[in-house]
Amino acid sequence: LEMLPKIKMCSENYPIKDINYLYAPKLADFQKESLSVLNISESMTINSEKYRHIEADELLAVVHPSYHKGYILEQFKFQPTWVIKWLRNTYLPYAKNFKAHKKVFLDRTDSLNTHCQFQNEKEISDYLIKENGFVKYQLTKLSFFEKIFLFNNAEIIFGAHSSGFMNLVFCKPHTKVIEVKPVFHTNAVSKRISEINDLNYQLIETKAVEENKKNSGDIFLPLNELIKNIKNFI
């Protein structure tokens, strides 16, 4: 939702074939895959983290379509409908089929930091997997096109807030979504995508965790609260 809408806006006035280079931070594999659909190869990109100064005859800079003013993460609530529709129309045909389960638990334990990690991960996992039939998926282990299929195939998705929820773009209408995040976190992008795609979205906000207790994560979700929300939702 960060880079692709800007490219779409730019292409409305400047055909992609006429653009020589894309100047952006180092690309993750899923970003390279998404750009390949638009015929933008890795050789066309310049790593802005490595090359801090560049010179060009013509430079095109695009402001994100959801941004108006203030803190960028708070602005995602203004995500335009056309962005989601364009992403669906462009990328859903490339979904890569694999043996994916309908009940998806987004697993962030492979993350390098403790932001939006469950302190009681094992307790939550045991309940969701053993008693409700969820299956864990680490999105870093999937290709971009497999992520598209995973989300489009799912009936219910549960997880702590993360950039992985951007893939709600590809969900079918009425897919159930349970997102857990700290009460102080203002990013409402998942809710906005759910509104546009007509998803059945539920947010669980957790109390702030003391700084000296965040070494294992900044989310503590009491099991009884999870059980209550799951039973009322499924």
Residues covered by each model-derived region:
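The feature primarily captures lumenal catalytic ectodomains
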Residues: L1-I234
